[in-house]
């Protein structure tokens, strides 16, 4: 397919029709609203224009509140849903109907507010539980924590490290006063909890003696009464707090019946956010508003028909070359190339004046993935997973691209599995041995085997890499000729092709004159001359070395990179065979099955991701490096935006 052609739209409309106009543009879903270029307007007009106000901040806040409320309901009152269930559908008119929006937002705010109370209750509960834990060492002490002793005696509660013995503490205390006693209340793994009783006039000296043993005075805050009394009070507070928390959670659960309405209103508010963002990009004066944006060229007739119903003036024009970096990019795909959207989006969209890589990449990506995975069993799993997901979930946009890519890659994997004779490795042959079948039972036909034909697979991978890279060069040549730069195509790609042809002829001992490979020499001369064009003096010499180095290392590196196809094919087959062999050691089908399931689950998961990553590298680095011009900005039209619902198609 191709990159969608864009038109620049400039529009002036009467203010009274602004809301209706934006609503209509949103329903069309093919216009990206941008801020007008005021520099192109006359100074007299610019001084009267002002940016339109919008409530985008409030809309974003309300949208976040609605989404948070839905997430809280899912947390406190989870809803059972079918596995791989599709999103519910609704009409676009329902999304644009905001008659119940205000009440639903209040419900969402109430849910969020109650959750904040629950979180405060949790924090308070943690504080009370911590206080109870701090009192446990003192439960055996029948003395008030806030006690002040008697008229002459002081009682001080504290603790020392568990490694300090009570005898050492008592001895240190006896050295400063004989009228004092240290009482052990309790001990745990880290601390020893003590009560010091002495005359008040001896307290300072006693504490100084105990500090040698890292004695610390216990702090109980505003606690009154014994530790046991305080613990009972804290237990009562915890019970009351748990009761209040339970009531709060029940209140949230009672609002679970509003879940679908909250989701619907979240989508309504999501759409209002898009509307408010577009409104905030407009400029206007007392009676007129100015709009500028990018529209899909193929939608121009539909747009013009809609605009004729409004009191407005507009202009549609093609972007100038200097505007290309600002023009948004949208790829137009069919069912096959749409699957590669996730790959292109992960890397980078092409520039507006570039080339759509999806149709050029699709056959190679799918073929390479199948070669690297190459197992009928794994291919069947991928096909079934993709078909079931598309049938049950009815995915759209990015999810649809993923399912389609999984399906096509699964088909390729299955076909390559037929050619290599792999069905979960050699599982059938191992099962045959366990069941006592004759030798050769379960061994599938294969055109080539990655286990025995390693060099054949490696050479084949290199040949595919050569075809892949040359395809990229052909695309580069076509694009350069289209832009009137045939000279660069001749001296750059042309010289490399002459060198490749010359190398093949030299290998076949064809075309040499006096032992000199003429075609190869001509190609090298073309390459050196093309690489030094435009350079002068010493620059020509450096250009020659640079061209030689980049060509030799670049091409050899790129070609060798395709050896990963062989490596992954071999690794997947070896790992599968190893697990099958381990499962068959005991010669028992009951032991083979769990080893088979665990081993192939791991191997499948590893290869599913590994093949994707390495295939992605071959496309984005080796292939795209020959022709791709990235840096495109995604086309983001003003449209009905949803998170929880799908819009029913007409």
Predicted regions located by residue number:
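Long, charged N-terminal accessory/stalk domains
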Residues: 1-361, 389, 396-399, 403
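Conserved, carboxylate-rich catalytic/transport cores that coordinate ions
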Residues: 2-8, 16-22, 26-33, 300-650
């Amino acid at each position: 397919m191709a990159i969608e052609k864009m038109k620049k739209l400039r529009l002036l409309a009467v203010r009274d029709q602004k809301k209706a106009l934006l609503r209509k543009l949103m329903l069309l879903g093919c216009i990206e609203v941008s801020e007008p270029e005021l520099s192109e307007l006359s100074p007299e007009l610019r001084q009267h224009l002002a940016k339109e106000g919008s409530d985008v901040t409030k809309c974003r806040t309300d949208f976040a509140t609605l989404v948070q409320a839905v997430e809280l309901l899912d947390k406190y009152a989870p809803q059972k849903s079918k596995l791989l269930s599709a999103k519910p559908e609704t009409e676009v008119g329902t999304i644009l109907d905001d008659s119940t929006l205000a009440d639903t937002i209040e419900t969402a705010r109430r849910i969020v507010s109650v959750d904040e109370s629950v979180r405060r209750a949790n924090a308070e509960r943690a504080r009370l539980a911590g206080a109870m834990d701090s009192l446990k060492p003192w439960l055996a002490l029948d003395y008030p924590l806030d006690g002040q002793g008697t008229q002459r005696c002081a009682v001080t509660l504290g603790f020392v490290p568990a490694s300090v013995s009570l005898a050492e503490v008592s001895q240190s205390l006896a050295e400063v006063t004989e009228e004092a006693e240290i009482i052990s209340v309790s001990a745990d793994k880290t601390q020893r909890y003590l009560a010091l009783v002495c005359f008040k006039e001896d307290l300072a000296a006693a504490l100084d003696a105990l500090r040698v043993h890292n004695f610390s005075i216990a702090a109980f805050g505003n606690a009154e009464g014994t530790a046991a009394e305080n613990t009972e009070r804290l237990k009562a507070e915890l019970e009351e707090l748990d009761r209040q928390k339970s009531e709060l959670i029940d209140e949230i659960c009672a609002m679970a019946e509003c879940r679908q309405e909250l989701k619907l209103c979240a989508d309504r508010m999501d759409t209002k956010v898009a509307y408010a963002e577009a409104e905030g990009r407009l400029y206007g004066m007392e009676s007129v508003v100015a709009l500028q944006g990018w529209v899909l060229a193929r939608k121009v007739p539909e747009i013009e028909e809609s605009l004729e119903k409004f009191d407005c003036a507009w202009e549609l024009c093609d972007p100038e070359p200097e505007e290309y970096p600002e023009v948004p990019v949208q790829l137009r795909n069919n069912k096959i190339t749409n699957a590669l959207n996730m790959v292109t989006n992960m890397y980078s969209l092409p520039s507006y004046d570039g080339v759509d890589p999806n149709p050029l990449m699709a056959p190679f990506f799918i073929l390479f993935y199948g070669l690297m995975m190459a197992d009928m069993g794994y291919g069947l799993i991928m096909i079934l997973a993709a078909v079931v997901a598309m049938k049950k979930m009815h995915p759209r946009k990015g999810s649809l691209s993923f399912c389609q890519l999984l399906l096509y890659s699964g088909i390729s994997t299955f076909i390559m599995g037929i050619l290599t004779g792999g069905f979960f490795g050699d599982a059938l042959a191992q099962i045959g041995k366990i069941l006592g079948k004759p030798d050769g039972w379960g061994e599938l036909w294969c055109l080539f085997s990655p286990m025995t034909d390693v060099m054949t697979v490696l050479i084949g991978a290199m040949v595919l890499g050569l075809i892949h890279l040359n395809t990229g060069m052909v695309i580069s040549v076509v694009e350069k000729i289209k832009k009137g730069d045939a000279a660069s195509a001749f001296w750059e790609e042309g010289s490399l092709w002459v060198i490749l042809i010359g190398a093949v002829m030299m290998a076949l001992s064809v075309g040499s004159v006096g032992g000199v490979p003429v075609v190869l020499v001509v190609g090298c001369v073309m390459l050196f001359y093309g690489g030094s064009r435009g350079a002068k003096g010493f620059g020509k010499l450096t250009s020659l070395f640079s061209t030689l180095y980049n060509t030799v290392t670049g091409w050899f590196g790129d070609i060798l990179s395709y050896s990963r196809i062989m490596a992954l094919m071999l690794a997947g087959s070896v790992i599968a065979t190893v697990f099958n062999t381990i499962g068959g050691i005991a010669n028992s089908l009951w032991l083979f099955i769990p080893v088979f399931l665990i081993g192939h689950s791991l191997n499948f998961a590893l290869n599913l991701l590994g093949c994707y990553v390495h295939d992605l590298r071959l496309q984005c680095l080796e292939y795209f490096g020959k022709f791709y011009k990235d840096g495109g900005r995604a086309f983001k039209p003003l449209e009905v935006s949803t998170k929880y619902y799908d819009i029913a198609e007409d």
